């Protein structure tokens, strides 16, 4: 079913962990979902996060599929296959860490490790109805992950429940010390962003049920940060993968995106860095007034596979609410919330102060406990 690109057992008898195939495991090739790396030699050493998983006595169960070169949000991959979204088989699994999210949602792994450059952990987690964390930039080692250089990308965990996700952070993030859930006094800023009204209503109801006090909030440069984030992604991905274009080695969608990325100017990058600084300060200032910031992970249900293949605008709408926090570097967690009418799970995003991943996870756990109690 294309969730895994290779299945094997490595390590102890602890929790089952799936690893995205853009992260090195010694003895196994890292192909990043691309024909361009079909003949890649086996990695000679483990990525830091893989070594941490093995040191904890956990069991790696295989390498998971992804959107080619981790440069896409649908998870559709015509070379290595497209994972099935376990909660909605007619809809995209999300990308780029599609197989990682699908493996956890299908119960094939307790935890998965992915990467998030512009939403690539949070988007598939939300699509597949599980939890996923983009840690504070730099908090979790990227050594052994592709691309080798990125000012946006973060290695992060997926899990069906917050207890497992927190356990994963304890393993892959040195110094991660879980915090107890707060008792009262949680004042959250719910960002005023464009999304389907019924989706926002469901998420706000879950927040109310948790006993959190919420207030609407607007960030002036939120939309600009989305565009600036793409500018930075384009420059960095062209530097990493531009040499693969024009050779028939990569899929048409990724080839087109890379060629478009090649036209990014130095002036555009400079402007994006100005937005990065300004928006980061805006988020920092907002977090002085609120415990965390909240917003939907996706503005709508994931597009169907048919919509995605037909180039629907729904695909372009998958990342506006996640990419800004790659640009700013703040930790951002998506927690599943069940829609009353359909039974599908959508994502509520929790954004915290830099370095306070533990606090973000504590609130995520509290929210999930409240949701379970009210079901």
Which residue ranges define each predicted feature?
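Short, well-ordered alpha-helical
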Residues: 1-47, 52, 66-72, 196, ...
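Short helix-loop capping/hinge segments that flank enzyme active sites or metal/cofactor-binding pockets
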Residues: 14-32, 231-277, 336-345
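Gly/Ser-rich, acidic/histidine-flanked active-site/gating loops
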Residues: 17, 23, 171-231, 256, ...
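Short pre-catalytic strand/loop immediately N-terminal to key active-site residues, enriched for Gly-Thr
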Residues: 37-43, 81-96, 311, 318
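Gly/Ser-rich catalytic serine loop of serine hydrolases
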Residues: 45, 89-101, 114-115, 119-120, ...
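Serine-dependent amide/ester hydrolase catalytic core
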Residues: 50, 240-327
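Structural helix-boundary/capping segments
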Residues: 55, 106, 110-111, 115-194, ...
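Alpha-to-beta junction loops
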Residues: 57-61, 107-111, 290-292
